[in-house]
Amino acid sequence: MRIPTICFLFLLISLSKSLHIGSCLGLICGRNGHCHAGPVNGTQTSYWCRCDEGFGGEYCEQQCDVSKCGADEKCVFDKDYRMETCVCKDCDINGNSLLKPSCPSGYGGDDCKTQGWCYPSVCMNGGQCIGAGNRAKCACPDGFKGERCELDVNECEENKNACGNRSTCMNTLGTYICVCPQGFLPPDCLKPGNTSTVEFKQPVCFLEISADHPDGRSMYCQNGGFCDKASSKCQCPPGYHGSTCELLEKEDSCASNPCSHGVCISFSGGFQCICDDGYSGSYCQEGKDNCVNNKCEAGSKCINGVNSYFCDCPPERTGPYCEKMDCSAIPDICNHGTCIDSPLSEKAFECQCEPGYEGILCEQDKNECLSENMCLNNGTCVNLPGSFRCDCARGFGGKWCDEPLNMCQDFHCENDGTCMHTSDHSPVCQCKNGFIGKRCEKECPIGFGGVRCDLRLEIGICSRQGGKCFNGGKCLSGFCVCPPDFTGNQCEVNRKNGKSSLSENLCLSDPCMNNATCIDVDAHIGYACICKQGFEGDICERHKDLCLENPCSNGGVCHQHRESFSCDCPPGFYGNGCEQEKMFRCLKSTCQNGGVCINEEEKGRKCECSYGFSGARCEEKINLTGFTEKDSLLRSVCEKRKCSERANDGNCDADCNYAACKFDGGDCSGKREPFSKCRYGNMCADFFANGVCNQACNNEECLYDGMDCLPAVVRCPVKIREHCASRFANGICDPECNTNGCGFDGGDCDNETNATIITNIRITVQMDPKEFQVTGGQSLMEISSALRVTVRIQRDEEGPLVFQWNGESEMDRVKMNERQLTEQHVLSTSISRKIKRSATNIGVVVYLEVQENCDTGKCLYKDAQSVVDSISARLAKKGIDSFGIPISEALVAEPRKSGNNTGFLSWNALLLIGAGCLIVMVVLMLGALPGNRTRKRRMINASVWMPPMENEEKNRKNHQSITSSQHSLLEASYDGYIKRQRNELQHYSLYPNPQGYGNGNDFLGDFNHTNLQIPTEPEPESPIKLHTEAAGSYAITEPITRESVNIIDPRHNRTVLHWIASNSSAEKSEDLIVHEAKECIAAGADVNAMDCDENTPLMLAVLARRRRLVAYLMKAGADPTIYNKSERSALHQAAANRDFGMMVYMLNSTKLKGDIEELDRNGMTALMIVAHNEGRDQVASAKLLVEKGAKVDYDGAARKDSEKYKGRTALHYAAQVSNMPIVKYLVGEKGSNKDKQDEDGKTPIMLAAQEGRIEVVMYLIQQGASVEAVDATDHTARQLAQANNHHNIVDIFDRCRPEREYSMDLHIQHTHQPQPSRKVTRAPKKQTSRSKKESASNSRDSTHLTPPPSDGSTSTPSPQHFMNTTHTTPTSLNYLSPEYQTEAGSSEAFQPQCGAFGNGEMWYTRASTSYTQMQNEPMTRYSEPAHYF
């Protein structure tokens, strides 16, 4: 019975389909077309032919002429099947490529970067994967359901009224049909007839994903359109268009642009014009643009009107054209004066200045130093508020620098040198020929003399017939003896001002060879030669092998020529260094070997090559045959070694560490498959970081071939370093300084960098937590070096994100030395000592952040996953210990918000609970004492901290904010009161109830107290609608009343004004935000209310960079000196934002000027924050702060007794991060103390050496910074660089040791007689711990380095003072000042006293207090010990 019924049903459906197409039965679309029912016109159904590709015409009777197209093209008709055109073979009729990226499993999107379980094609039946990460899911079209849209929806069961009462509903795949009784017609089955009794419900064609429909909207083809399931698109009948064929071609009423000055909106049957401001009429034809040639001042906005215009002024301006300033709009606009209304003045107000100030806004201090000869004898006049002081030149003292001092009294010249006074009474040593140095303490190599030991004694430099001595110098035995005020081989350099008296005459003598350019550099060397390419040396006398610096990028081959080099660039690249990629047009033959030309908006045009080909135009064939054989062999090796059985066991098996073996199941690659996105994954894994550029692997997916295609960084040449430093960031492009090594001339040649920060990089380290606590952030130095970026440990409100690891999950947080990590900032290259790997599964989990300075906007790393892949690839290639620590896993993960362990209370929690119980017991015992006391206890009204309960601690940490003040009402969950429970407890005080004897009132006095009540967890509340709208992108619609304006949301403790001020949405204009803020303040909003992070609306407005809102809030009484939980004021935050304009405005407030030296939680002033962050306006910001009263060398001394005091100045922070413009401003322009020690005894050059800041180290050395000073752990700057594997910086220090001393050491080693030990002079070691008996002032005094400067002054010690001092470990450094340096590597230069073995290990000659052990050793191999701090 069932089989006949089914047969009848299929017969019914087949007949119904035939009847349904109506007049298509008689239409002949030919063999090359398909007939479809078209749009219904009244009761008449039309039809149309859908032609196969290459055919057209009304009945598909015309065939396209292929002969008109190229070999790689095909001939097609347009969408109306009328016009012929040629497109590429893999393109649609509009010329758009049909090729889609073949994304790997788990990734999707146009660029295969979106990660989710349902990508790329898990969803079935037209479903689409949406979302990312844990939120990824399949969005199903109507008619399907299930996790993968694999289930058909039975519409007949879910909707009983799917068909009418007289018809029968029958379910089909994705849709359903309605069957009428025999003899009646659909849709209502009331009309009799003999045609089809079946109504087919059209299935969904495609799913539309948009901003308005993020979960998808089912789209159906209209007007007879045909759904092409292969492309999920509607093919429309002729005359119709649109994604669902919903539009008639003739219905586009806006096609003729009928609106003259407005926007045309088309609708069925007509259109409407939305006119621009100032225009009206049906077609916006009436009116004109009155804003043409308007007079509105810059910064204002012209608003067009019907007959005129008006100017919308910013808050600080007024007048018809915003040409006048409104002092009432900005508090304290008259900085040191009183604002007086003056309607007749040009500004509409006048400032009456206080004594000692001047300027339009009383912003300028009267500079007494403008008077001539205020300070005598080259003294420097320093202007002070209302006064001045004289900083005297060396050799003079007194208030006016008019008292000469005898500087030779304590100034001893060695080797028979004579001390003489210059005209400014500075002591100088006139050395005998053959000796140099500040005190003639260094002897030139045998046979050489002159001020740089660069003149041969047998030749000399002066004679009666030859060279002469200038400036009164006398020629004696071929050499010039100079008067005290001059130095140089020919007395050509003036000691006093550092200028050559001959100036241009020096270069007119043409001292430079090989067409080099001669320039005047500074006082030390007088002139310098800028060499042409291919030459080097002091006077460019030597040929240089330029190819040793690897200047060719992208696999270019370097060729050395006599005076230059050239690069043979691979196809697709050009430029002197093959650094530029050729641009091309997408033509027929652009891409070879089957490649397809794709035009991408962001990346430009490129060829997407067929498999097996690479190159810019797919011209290179990849040798896949050879590698396929190798890969096949490796796969068989993996099978023979049973790698699959040993995979994923937690141990890296080196014999299975191949891409073909999946890197031992991830055991050797941090549990990742780093080359999973790479098209040639196994091949590129083999080529990774092998030193040879492979273009097929030089892309983001293949991790840029391990950076093999990047050029080497060339150092700034020694002889032009000072030249480039003096011209750094001066606004003029100096091409010779426009290199990476020279800092790109400070951006003067438009070479700028943008910093990006990537977070949530999680690594698991097989190391005991105790050992990781000791090593701290230094364990990550090698990662920074290998990835070519800055790597830091990520942190939250509780500190560094480092957790214990039990082999399966994260446990307790590891307490790190936050101060040490903060000081490091940039974690450097490697750990030199062997790391002991944990024998068990115990380890640590560390969350990292990466900061990359992207050249010209091109970053190596797009997201955290790309960083993780690079780490994993290096682990697989170099070993899991390749970063100095054993990394067993690397992945992208968000830090957990709870810091407690998962199975038991931590010892810290137990101790806290125990301490709390002890406090309770003590107080209870006190309350039980006899009540015969007559004196009342003094009660202090202070909050008492209570150790949190276990559940409370979990709740608090689960709901805390990781980033302070960055809250949102648009989060997925909204929890009312849980977040701030600990802070709520701080408002309670714990007192015992009166017990035993005595009067409770006597015990408590008259104090009104509240017994401790631990708040219970309330039910979650819904977000406040007014707050949600304030935080959104559109205008507030909820009424702002006196009652609603100060309602506080329980989660973030914010009012509506907080949410308005923190709104940084680009879609919400600042005009609207200011307007809403005005409404709130008019309704009685508290402008100084603080949220849970103690941020006021003003602070949030500064964070959001809303300058106009900040101006209005301050006018309304907002206090800029309120500090948040990070102990930052609005000025601190403006400095952290690098917002120069906001800082200018903030410093107009006299309130903030008094707090300009205040420290934030990190112990930094606003000037220190500016110095610590690079940026375009940072020097201008620093100058502004100094002009407003910030002290250059302020170290936070006012807060010496607080934990945040570090004793550092702005120069420390600038040197630590290599902020060279700030370093040069502080040292070069403001004379900042170069040798100031912080609390750990570190000077700026020590921090720079420790962090690998080579440019800072060179500059500070040139400026005379001490290199022999030691920190609190008795380490010099060289030792800090050595311990952190910054060998290039160690090399800089070692270059300063002359060949003479090296030869003497070798001579001593060959001598068999014991020598007397050398005297060791060391700067005193600063105490690392303080005695309780010491006063705070003694322990935290800011001190200069000792011994004192050689010249007797209190400024920076002279480096020459330390030239004969040594250290016990390692070998002492001997420093030559820039005045006497010679180019390293030249035939006449001093050679470093160090070398390198083949394995990179350094050797040194020992400089010990005893040479007895070395008598029989011609050379001692010496490995420098590692140091950890």
Curated annotation (Swiss-Prot):
Keywords: Activator, ANK repeat, Cell membrane, Developmental protein, Differentiation, Disulfide bond, EGF-like domain, Glycoprotein, Membrane, Notch signaling pathway, Nucleus, Repeat, Signal, Transcription, Transcription regulation, Transmembrane, Transmembrane helix. ANK repeats lie at residues 1093-1122, 1126-1158, 1162-1194, 1206-1236, 1240-1269. Pfam families: Ank_2, EGF, EGF_2, EGF_CA, hEGF, NOD, NODP, Notch. PROSITE patterns: ANK_REP_REGION, ANK_REPEAT, ASX_HYDROXYL, EGF_1, EGF_2, EGF_3, EGF_CA, LNR. Residues 20-61, 114-150, 152-190, 201-246, 250-285, 287-323, 323-363, 365-402, 404-441, 449-492, 503-541, 543-579, 582-619 form the EGF-like domain. Residues 1-15 form the signal peptide. Residues 1308-1374 are annotated as: Disordered. The chain crosses the membrane at residues 909-931. Disruption phenotype: RNAi-mediated knockdown in cells of the pi uterine cell lineage results in impaired basement membrane mobility. Knockdown on a glp-1 mutant background impairs octanol response when animals are shifted to the restrictive temperature. It comes from the Eukaryota. Belongs to the NOTCH family. Essential signaling protein which has a major role in many developmental processes; involved in cell fate decisions that require cell-cell interactions. Probable membrane-bound receptor for putative ligands lag-2, apx-1, dsl-1 and osm-11. Upon ligand activation, and releasing from the cell membrane, the lin-12/Notch intracellular domain (NICD) forms a transcriptional activator complex with lag-1 and lag-3 and regulates expression of various genes. Required for ventral cell fates in the postembryonic mesodermal lineage (M lineage) and in uterine precursor cells. May interact with dsl-1. May interact with lag-2. May interact with osm-11. Interacts with sel-10. This is Protein lin-12.
